[in-house]
């Protein structure tokens, strides 16, 4: 569902007094749903750091920057020096924070983050394949990829299979969330 559909559904629930409060399972910059709930004074909780009005919003979050840094540190400790990042756009705050942690780790280890080593998409409908193909087939390609979430990690694993890259022999992948998706891949994802 897009923001407009979710907003319509919430406005309908409010008009018909079908809900006392709302839980938003994401945090996104310029989110019309969160803006509407805030402007109407409706009780809501956001899973993820609030993008706007954080001091006036109830939210539950983990330290995504630290998680990104620690995951990248792990890859570095495993011997990887060319580590790429694959995630959703910076509009999704969790991904922006994980990318920031990835960049902090690289800098800490004396590696300059390269914009070309980051592939970001808005939706799975985006044409991410050319950018991923360029990244993964270039001379000196990454030996590891930090991925913002398990769904994208599955997408990456399938794409690597098309390219003939074997996980983890040719490319290591580390992701987040430890969801069911991470356990149904072959081999299972590190998450």
Where do the language-model regions lie?
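Bacterial carbohydrate/catabolite-sensing allosteric modules
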Residues: 36-46, 50-191
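Short N-terminal targeting/anchoring amphipathic segment
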Residues: 22-25, 146-147
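Short beta->alpha connector loops
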Residues: 2-5, 25-31, 151
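Structural motif corresponding to alpha-helix initiation and N-cap regions
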Residues: 7-8, 30-31, 125, 129
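Short acidic/histidine-rich motifs immediately flanking catalytic phosphotransfer sites
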Residues: 15-21, 139-143
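A composition-driven signal for long, intrinsically disordered, charge-rich low-complexity tracts
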Residues: 10-11, 15, 22, 180
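Amphipathic helical "hinge" segments at domain boundaries
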Residues: 1-10, 21, 103, 107
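Short low-complexity stretches enriched in small and charged residues
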Residues: 1-4, 14-16, 39-42
């Amino acid at each position: 569902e897009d923001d407009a559909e979710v907003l319509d559904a919430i406005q309908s629930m409010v008009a018909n007094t079908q809900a006392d409060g709302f839980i938003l399972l994401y945090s996104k910059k310029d989110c019309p749903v969160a803006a509407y709930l805030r402007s109407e004074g409706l009780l809501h909780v956001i899973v993820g750091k609030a993008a706007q009005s954080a001091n006036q919003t109830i939210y539950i979050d983990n330290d995504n920057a630290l998680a990104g840094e620690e995951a990248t540190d792990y890859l570095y400790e495993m011997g990887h020096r060319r580590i790429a990042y694959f995630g959703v756009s910076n509009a999704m705050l969790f991904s922006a924070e994980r990318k920031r942690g990835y960049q902090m780790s690289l800098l800490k280890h004396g590696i300059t983050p390269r914009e070309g080593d980051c592939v970001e998409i808005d939706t799975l409908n985006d044409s991410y394949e050319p950018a991923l193909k360029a990244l993964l087939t270039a001379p000196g390609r990454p030996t590891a990829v930090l991925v913002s979430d398990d769904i994208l990690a599955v997408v990456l694993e399938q794409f690597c299979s098309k390219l003939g890259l074997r996980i983890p022999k040719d490319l290591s992948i580390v992701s987040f969330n430890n969801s069911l998706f991470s356990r149904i891949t072959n081999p299972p994802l590190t998450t």
